[in-house]
C-alpha cells in the first residue's frame, strides 16, 4: 500500500530545498515515489511500501498525511498524474466506443429504465458490452490511483 506524506518546500535566495526521493526500486523498478501536487504551499508525495526514503534536508519537516475524503478529492483534482489517468481512461473507452455511442447507450438505457423504450434486437447485449468495457476502464483508473495512495 502506498502512503502519502507532506512537507513545505523551503526557498533560499539561490535554491529551492525539496524532499530527496530515492531512485526507482523493486525487481523491475516499479516502486518509486511520486510528487502528487502542491496545495496552499504544502507538497504531497506518494511513497509506496517497500521504499526507504533517503536522509532528508534538515530544513524540511516531512509528516505522514491523514487522508480525509476532502483532501483526497483536492489532491486528485490538482495532481497531473490523476489528470493523466483520467485521460487514459477516456482513451481506453474511446478506442472502442465514440462519444455518440455513449450518448446512444445513455438514451436507450434511461428510456428502458423509465419504461418509455423497449430494446431492439441486440441492443441489450450491446449496452451490456459497453457497460462492461467502461467499467473495466474505470477499474483500471481506480487501480492506478490506488498505486498513488488515492
Which residues does each PLM region occupy?
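A preference for well-ordered globular domain cores
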Residues: 1-150
